[in-house]
Amino acid sequence: MNQILLCSQILLLFFTVANCDGEHQLDSSVDLKSAVLKNVAPKNVATQAEIVKDDVALKSGKKGDYVMDIEVSDMPLDDYPINNSKSRKNSSTLPSPILTDKLNQGSNQIALKALKHRLVMEQNNNLFLRNHSVSLMNEIEARKTDIIQARQLNIDLELELESLKRKLSEMNVQNARKSTKSCKKRPSKDIAPPVNQLQEVIVKNTYRNKYLTLLTQLAQKINYEIANVNNPATDVPTGKSPSEGNPSTT
């Protein structure tokens, strides 16, 4: 953009210089034309006297009459054929200022056309660069939107991944808890019972055996007492009280 502004300023400077040169050349051409038009022959007194002497109208005229003078000398020198030939010779030998002005004007027009063409090219280049910059800005905005959408999608995927990790850890914890629970199924014959169940069976058997022994001893004592009551003569003192009884025989 800075180069484009610099080129536009340079072109504006060229236009102002060309306009100033054109105005200066026009002023010089006007001065030259006015100088050429003022190129008249000076008055000659001797030739004027000869004209009066030879003229019949002037001879027949009375004194005191106002005679109109033919201002031959006031005519421009270009009207005479001799002067025209001289002017042609001079124009062929010396460069005419009008021709130089025309040449300068032609060169100025060529330079002006070249500058206009250069200006049009710069404007087209500027327009192309502007359109290219606009397209680049649009592409940048589109890329920004794509990046924002990709980031949002990445965030969503990260959240889903975190939720899946959490669910997986919960499932692992539940599986670990299930594996630590005791089995409620009945033990098979091949598998030995646990220690607690064995101790319980042993205790039950010992108490049952003790209960059975006590019952048998009680039954034997009752039978012995009944027999002693029925046969008192056969009672022989042994130094023991009848309540002690005989030792049990199993």
From Swiss-Prot:
Q: Which UniProt keywords apply?
A: Behavior, Glycoprotein, Secreted, Signal
| InterPro entries in alphabetical order | Male_ac_gland_sc
The UniProt record lists the keyword Cell inner membrane: no
Annotated region (Disordered), positions in chain: 79-100, 172-191, 230-250
What tissue expression does the UniProt record report for this protein? Main cells of the accessory glands of males.
Q: So which domain of life are we looking at? A: Eukaryota
Q: Does the keyword Secreted apply?
A: yes
Where composition is biased (Basic residues), the residues are 178-187
Q: Where is the composition biased (Polar residues)?
A: 82-95, 240-250
Q: Which residues are glycosylated?
A: 83, 90, 131
PTM section of the record = Proteolytically cleaved as it is secreted and in the recipient female.
Question: Where found, per UniProt?
Answer: Secreted, Extracellular space
The leader peptide range reads 1-18
Which GO CC terms are listed, alphabetically? Answer: extracellular region
- Please give the biological process terms from Gene Ontology that the record holds: mating
Q: What does this protein do?
A: This protein is transferred from male to female's hemolymph during mating, affecting egglaying and behavior after mating.
List the protein's name: Accessory gland-specific peptide 26Aa
Q: What is the lineage of its organism?
A: Eukaryota, Metazoa, Ecdysozoa, Arthropoda, Hexapoda
